[in-house]
Amino acid sequence: MLLFEQPVDLEKNNEDDTNIKPFAISRHFLLKLLLCGIILIELLLYSKCPKPIDNGPRTIANRSNTYFNGTHDFKTLTILISIDGFHPRLIDAKYTPFLYNLHNLRSPYDMNITTAPYMIPSFPTQTFPNHWSMVTGKYPIEHGIVSNIFWDNFTSSEFRPNNLDARIWSNTADPIWQLLQTESQGEYKVATHMWPGSEVVYEDHGDVPRERMPFYFGKFNQWEKLQDKLAQIFRYIDMPQLKDRPELVISYIPNVDSYGHSFGYDLRDKRLQKLIGEVDGFFLDLIEGLQKRNLLKISNVMIVSDHGMSNVNANDGEHVVVWERVFPADAMSAFISHLYNEGPMMMVCLKNPRDKQWICDLIEAQLEKAYGDEISRKFHVILKEDFDPSWKYFQYDNRKHRYDDRVGDIWILADEYYAIVKEMGDVPIGIMGTHGYNFNNCSDMASIFIGMGPMFNNEVVPPFENIEVYNMLIKASALLGEEKTKKEKSLLQ
């Protein structure tokens, strides 16, 4: 159902009727009266039209307001969409002209736009930890999804991206949809589409509230076409009843990341040009769809990514090391219980954590023996207790965290443009793309942020951490008072 284009009624008409008694009127007075009437009519018509957005803040702070778009009443709408693996350098005047214009504060519809040169991802720069950071406002060590893959001692099971085990997910920080749906007693509805962690079903997990699940959610489908994704977003927005319609829509685009892992990022690659051009067209169609529905002036749209991508040369035998050459299988089975992740890092879980120091030293020695000093120096073997506090990971603030036991005992961390894989068969051919590096050491991990709509100023802000997205969603909801955000500051405060 298309909500047809009509002016958005953002103001009430409070004019009073006035009784005018008859009296003698001159021609000159009649002309003046007619002229005043014309001016008055024009002013009244103008007051009914949507006002242009200026360059100042336009936060809509009262959720009790409804807005008429010509056919239906609406609450303010917030849309958050993440492009997995999208680095700022992919924003290009030639291949992504719409995103390029937005990033440079140029909009065809006079929208307020806030951008940053880049957004800072959390460590590890992987998909699931960072998407959960954006919807919880916490670092991975604080929200519980400490990596794309880890061992959960509580359930004695392995977490992977396709693991929807409610026992693991219920033991993580509360997402934004749980907060907003709980605070509104179900009146505020959230719809998600493929956002990592949003499709977990808790119905058989009796102690978990229903609000832990988005009111509407869609299952992951990596083959979904972008136009089908857009159609689903507008199906949510076009629901005829105000009480059924979600006020927050959250969606996820996996296409760019999937391509980058296989081929890396090179803007000379015509396949990559085509792919990011399709993503650009998706966002143009989204904004134009909102404009056709006369919803643009009451919609806040945020375009983000979880991390970037770094290219690794897998052909030269120098940039990729193989674990099975470092630690033989029989030795591994004797001391190591689990081995997780590949690429920029490897997480080693020991059968007996008391062995960690000498096994750490052994791995370091075996690396040098297998690959020589020059290559082995690109890989750093550390205990989890030795993470730099600036990474905001294991006990970064000198205190224990609830999810410390999900972090492996020993880590192998590669320098930028280097990677580690488990077996020879895992070594790709040619250039591969990977992510997981700490942003402080690898600018390729940077992500994007573009915010547009009435709650934003028209400006470029300094880079900020992606946990701030959570604060913006709270502000956009106009649901909670500042004292309930439990945050000392927000980018938009």
From Swiss-Prot:
Q: Does the keyword Hydrolase apply?
A: yes
Cellular component (GO) terms are: endoplasmic reticulum; membrane
Q: Name one GO molecular function term.
A: phosphodiesterase I activity
Q: Which residues lie on this side of the membrane: Extracellular?
A: 46-493
**What Pfam families does the record point to?**
Phosphodiest
One of its GO biological process terms is: nucleoside triphosphate metabolic process
Q: How is it modified after translation?
A: Autophosphorylated as part of the catalytic cycle of phosphodiesterase/pyrophosphatase activity.
**Bilayer topology annotation:** Single-pass type II membrane protein
The protein's name: Ectonucleotide pyrophosphatase/phosphodiesterase 2
The organism's lineage is: Eukaryota, Fungi, Dikarya, Ascomycota, Saccharomycotina
